[in-house]
Amino acid sequence: MKVLIDDKIPYIRSAAQWLLGDVDYLPGHAFGDSRQLAEADALIIRTRTHCDEALLANAHRLRFIATATIGHDHIDADYLRRRGIAWTNCPGCNAASVAQYVRNSIVKTSFSLLENREQRTENSLENREERSIHAPLTVGIVGYGHVGRAVRRAVEAMGCRVLLNDPPLEEAIRTQLRRSSISYLTPEESPSVEGVLPPEGEIEGASPSTTFVTLQEIAEQSDVITFHTPLTTGGSHPTLHLADSAFFASLRRRPVIINAARGGVVDEQALLCAHRDGLVGPMVIDTWEGEPNINSHLLREAFIATPHIAGYSADGKSCATRMALRAVCRHFGIPIDDEAQFLALTAPPSLPPEVQPSGRWADDALTLYDPLLDTARLKASPATFEQQRGTYPLRRETFE
């Protein structure tokens, strides 16, 4: 069996050689120029490789593609289905990294938040021995997939109250419950979901006890609003400009706005107007409309501005590599006989020995990742957005 692998996928070479044997590496853009493609049984790729008929017409042996990414817009699923080629992506591989970004951004904006609520006291983040940032902020999470769930865990650990909004997921849960001929009057009346709902992943985060609120409630009650939806233009719940001028006009608490979803989920012109009108507090922008040619006015006014790197941690890349390799092994019936060896071969690099936790959670969080450092680089050189993203030094999520 021959496997072709994108040569920019980190932490994969030793494990791939150990598990798969006959492995070749190519730049993502060079797969179409390679005679090796005709001999490949499997590909492990990134978004740079567009898997469609133009690329794969002569790949007669190909049976499986794993993309070591969450996104799969570069996969022509209909064509692969017609060809009988199986494929997978790596959903949730960088969810913890995005959650780290959101949590640390909240830490950096917390003093402004406390001023908004007139609760900046000695018990706030100035006393970093405290576990919670104060009693408590309300964080509205829009989009409750893998990333939204990771964000919820991260901010609840800080002592925050959480509001959830995800109409498609809420409808999917209701539909599944109707099919099961079971209805619940309140979350408290809900029995165990075992045997009622499909396993997590078929309906992400599905549980009849999950409480959702409307976007209007998010707008009225939240101190922080963070977006984690895909960008969609059709269907009953399109997300293009989900946060528009009407949404910003309904805000009540001058919240922090965080967009680490997709550029276009937030209407940037409406956001700028709302910020200038005092409706919005600090702005945290990682995903931009028109990338890499980003809005210079928004860049200037954003408190945190980064080049679409919220998910760029070494831990997340390691997770994607592991998921992709496991998928190939599962598809071809290749056993992973030594799990400890597999994890060791795909592990991200350790931090320098001088980088040690202090025991003060906020300090430790910012030691691992301070988003203002990335902000300074982007504001100094916005024209190098794509270069900064492509050469980003992968951060660690933990001290381990």
What are these regions (language model features)?
Residues 1-40:
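N-terminal glycine-/charge-rich "phosphate-binding" loop or analogous flexible N-terminal tail
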Residues 30, 158-177:
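NAD(P)-binding Rossmann-fold cofactor-contacting core
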Residues 62, 135-138, 254:
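Phosphate-coordination loops involved in phosphoryl transfer and adenosine-cofactor binding
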Residues 85-153:
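Phosphate-binding beta-alpha-beta segment of Rossmann-like dinucleotide-binding domains, i.e.
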Residues 114-135, 174-211:
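Intrinsic disorder/low-complexity segments
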Residues 254-400:
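Rossmann-like dinucleotide-binding domain for NAD(H)/NADP(H)
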